[in-house]
């Protein structure tokens, strides 16, 4: 069986495969594969994590397995996922490993790998690790074990890297920024980056206790940030998720600036406009229309930063992302980086001398309605001619003014019916009509 999903290995801590025993075996299996594929006799792996309590247990197990396989490990401590990607390259490591479940609650955790280039591990290497996991853990040579050391300046290295992506002749001296750290991996480095560039920073949710990561805070719960920006009279707010690979922002009036807004700013307001942008099937149609008017290319990928990255590489572009706040700027970083994405927006604000709300003044998201249709048993909506006819009819009705998206959930018997368009009432009516059509056909089936 394959333990790897689209974003590494993830699950509830204490249940397979997120257990100390499995992490030990995984470290050993990965170490064996890295030794075979490494030009060095003793390959180096950098290992970082977010702030979950279970991360410390998994870290100990992983490093023990890696050391037993003869791999040297540099322990980075709690740091954003993109920081691990950067330090994998900066420290000339053969691979990087992150222990994190991103925006999930504290009781979940995950393990994912980066290649020596700071990119997601190739599928071929993941398959080799899977095969190695089927073997017994057997230490052949006790004279050639690896060892682990803690990197004491990891935070500083990453802070300097982030600052290097912000124009050296710019500063943030006149800005007051509220930063929501989600009690996560950016709790220290996030506020530090903006302070060192001159901003007055109000840090929120920056006291992790191992259990409060993402709890009613961060990019998935920006409500308290929206309130805090107004209360503090700040110029803007920035919210990360637990591992700081997602970011959403808030203007001085408390309005939310999501991933679609950020892509709009980077694609149409920046001094150097990109040739094209990659969104996903969830990107609002308003973004597609705005980019077309600005003569900026646009393509949609499947949901997931892995697919956004793939589409960027296929098109030779550097800018892409998702409404959730996964933003990739491949000319700055190899993976989605919340701090760097925020800095790119701040760069546009400084170079144009405009407030955040002014940058999106002409950009209005189309009304969007999402209806989750729960079924007794999953069905494929596109295998039923009557439903396909309804979908086609709806698409024809919205032609040029909106769109529909019908998706099956990958984890539960739910059909997601999404409709968006330029008329809110029409969108609501159409979404409910299509949802009812799915319900009716499910009863017939």
Curated annotation (Swiss-Prot):
Modified how: Activated by phosphorylation.
Note describing how the cofactor binds: Binds 1 Mg(2+) ion per subunit.
Keyword presence, Magnesium: yes
Pfam families: PGM_PMM_I, PGM_PMM_II, PGM_PMM_III, PGM_PMM_IV
Catalytic activity field: alpha-D-glucosamine 1-phosphate = D-glucosamine 6-phosphate
GO CC term (a single one): cytosol
Superkingdom in the source lineage: Bacteria
PROSITE patterns found in the cross-reference section: PGM_PMM
Cofactor(s) needed: Mg(2+)
EC number of the protein: 5.4.2.10
List of residues binding Mg(2+): 102, 241, 243, 245
Function, in words: Catalyzes the conversion of glucosamine-6-phosphate to glucosamine-1-phosphate.
Family: Belongs to the phosphohexose mutase family.
Protein name: Phosphoglucosamine mutase
Originating organism: Acinetobacter baumannii (strain ACICU)
Lineage: Bacteria, Pseudomonadati, Pseudomonadota, Gammaproteobacteria, Moraxellales
């Amino acid at each position: 069986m394959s333990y790897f999903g689209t974003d590494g290995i993830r699950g509830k801590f204490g249940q397979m495969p997120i257990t100390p025993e499995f992490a030990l075996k995984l470290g050993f299996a990965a170490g064996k594969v890295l030794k075979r594929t490494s030009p060095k006799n003793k390959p180096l792996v950098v290992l970082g994590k977010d702030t979950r309590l279970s991360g410390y247990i998994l870290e100990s197990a992983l490093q023990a397995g890696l050391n037993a396989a003869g791999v040297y490990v540099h322990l980075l401590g709690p740091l954003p996922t993109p920081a691990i990607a950067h330090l994998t390259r900066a420290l000339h490591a053969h691979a990087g490993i992150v222990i994190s479940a991103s925006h999930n609650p504290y009781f979940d955790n995950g393990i994912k790998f980066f290649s020596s280039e700071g990119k997601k591990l190739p599928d071929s290497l993941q398959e080799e690790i899977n095969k190695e996991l089927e073997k017994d853990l057997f230490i052949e040579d006790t004279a050639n074990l690896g060892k682990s050391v803690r990197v004491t300046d990891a935070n500083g290295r990453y802070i300097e890297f982030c600052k290097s992506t912000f124009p050296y002749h710019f500063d943030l001296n006149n800005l007051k920024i509220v930063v929501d750290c989600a009690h996560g991996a950016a709790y220290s480095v996030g506020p530090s980056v903006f302070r060192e560039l001159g901003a007055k920073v109000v840090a929120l949710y920056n006291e992790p206790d191992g259990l409060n990561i993402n709890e009613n805070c961060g990019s998935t719960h920006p409500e308290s940030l929206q309130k805090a920006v107004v209360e503090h009279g700040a110029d803007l707010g920035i919210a990360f998720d637990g591992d700081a690979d997602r970011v959403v922002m808030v203007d001085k009036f408390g309005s939310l600036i999501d991933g679609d807004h950020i892509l709009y700013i980077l694609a149409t307001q920046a001094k150097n406009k990109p040739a094209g942008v990659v969104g996903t099937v969830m990107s609002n149609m308003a973004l597609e229309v705005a980019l077309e008017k600005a003569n900026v290319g646009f393509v949609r990928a499947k949901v997931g930063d892995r697919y956004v990255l793939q589409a960027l590489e296929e098109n030779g572009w550097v800018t892409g992302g998702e409404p959730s706040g996964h933003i990739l700027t491949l000319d700055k970083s190899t993976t989605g980086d919340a701090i760097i994405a925020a800095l790119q927006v701040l760069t546009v604000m400084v170079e144009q001398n405009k407030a955040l709300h002014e940058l999106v003044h002409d950009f209005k998201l189309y009304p969007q309605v999402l209806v989750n249709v729960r079924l007794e048993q999953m069905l494929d909506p596109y295998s039923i001619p009557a439903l396909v006819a309804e979908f086609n009819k709806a698409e024809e009705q919205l032609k040029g003014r909106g769109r529909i998206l019908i998706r099956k959930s990958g984890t539960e018997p739910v059909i997601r019916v999404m409709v968006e368009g330029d008329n809110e009432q029409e969108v609501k009516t159409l979404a409910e009509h299509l949802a009812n059509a799915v319900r009716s056909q499910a009863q017939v089936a």
